Structure formats: C-alpha cells, structure tokens
Amino acid sequence: MLTKAEASVTEPVSVSETSVSLSGVTRAYRTKRGQTVAVEGLDLRVAEGEVLGVVGPSGCGKSTLLELLAGLQEPDHGTVEVVGAATAEERRKVCSYMPQRDLLLPWRDALGNAALALESQGLARREARERAAPLFERFGLADFERSRPRALSGGMRQRVAFMRTLLPGRPVLALDEPFASLDAITRTDMQQWLADALAAEPRTVVLVTHDVEEALFLSDRVAVLSARPGRVLAELEVPLPRPRDRRAAVRDLDLARLRERALEVLGS
C-alpha cells in the first residue's frame, strides 16, 4: 500500500486553481425500456494543467461525462463548470472534445482535416492550413500533410485527430478512449507519444479509457467510477514525475500497486 507521502505528489485541488468542476451531477436518458441513469450525484474536480484519467465499467457514464464537459449535453441535476463556463454553449468555447473514432473526412488530406478545427472558428482555409502545418513536423507527421486518411496508419490518423482537437487553443481537452481502436504495439507507442505531446503543449485534460495501465501512465490522478449510474468510488494520485517513459513505467512498483488498487475497486 502506498504511504501518504508516496501518494501525495499531486497537490490537492483547491477552489482557486480548479479548472473543471462537477458537483452533484446527474444525467439520465429515456429509452424504450424506460429511464436509464448514466451518472448520478457525480462530484469531480480537476486542477488547471492536471491530467485526470477516468476508468470504469462499460456503460458507467464515462462518455456522458466528457460530453457534459464539452457542452454537448446539459446535466439534469447539479452543475458543470469548465474554466468558469457553466452553460453548454459556454463550455463548447473552452473545451475541445476528441471522440473515440478519429472521424477524419476522407475527401480531405491530413492537413485539411487538422485545419478544419480552425476553419470552423471562421479562419479562411488557406490561413487555417498555414497555422496547422507546423504541428505536422512536431508530431512526427512531416511529409504526410497531403496524404488522404485511407493512406495513414491508425496511429497517424489519431495524431491528426489530436491536432484537430488541439488547434483551437481551448484550455481543456476531453479525450474519449483515443487509442481504443489501435493494436497493442501501436497503442503503446501512442501512449508515449501523447505523454510527450502533453508535455510540449500542457493543457487540462480529462482522459477516459478502459485501460487502467494507460490511465496511470498518462494521468496525474485517476478517478475510478462505479457501474451505472456512475459515481466516483476512488481517486488515485499517481506518484510518477514528468516527463514519463513508458518502458520505465512498466517496471515502476508504485504504479503496479496503484494498478492493483484500481482493479480491486473496479471488482468490488
């Protein structure tokens, strides 16, 4: 079991530095079988610049949580605030959402897909492409700007999708299982890539994943949700300094203990 000192690398989230806040949030849906409550009484805080991982069973409301943050939904009860933005319309201006699928447009090249985020903000296509272009070299995609999505590997497509998420410059990113569709080797490579990308472009991040090891490697803190309706069962602080190395993390005993703890909570 981690000592208090080992588990306290990340400072507690104070009100003054909170970037994301959910208080008593409940969200339900009407289905043919009646009402389904996705999350109920959900409370979470995320500090400015913190990466929060969220894990939990399938159907526990993880994607609903991200859609609430990104302003794609409103809660039935409770409050959701992102950098002070309390309404869905306001949250859409400060939170960028990356869904599970890359959703690249097949008729646009990679640069055009990344630049689409800027075009949607009113920039002319040429200017948007000029602003997006420098990221391709930084993110290991130099010489692939003109490639269509069908010519890109799964990892490359996810990098383009991440650039599209990053380019609007919003302070908060909501990432919904960005590597779920990738094979194991590519997924491991992309975990290291994302860790490096977030080190170079720090943002407040809420990352949903089914992979406990992925959550621990990428996050400063991990929230474990219950089965539906989703509630926070535990919050685990990750005592791993940045920058992070995926190969070293595999051998880290503190992370191994945290993984066991997370799995215990999920199995309870």
Show the residue positions of the predicted features.
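Conserved ABC transporter NBD signature motif
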Residues: 7, 20, 78-90, 131
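A short, flexible loop at the N-terminus of ABC-type nucleotide-binding domains that lies
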Residues: 15-22, 28-41
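The feature captures the beta-strand-to-loop junction immediately N-terminal to the Walker
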Residues: 55-57
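Conserved ABC ATPase "signature" region
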Residues: 115, 119, 126-144, 196
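A short, proline-enriched helix->beta-strand linker immediately N-terminal to the Walker B motif
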Residues: 167-171
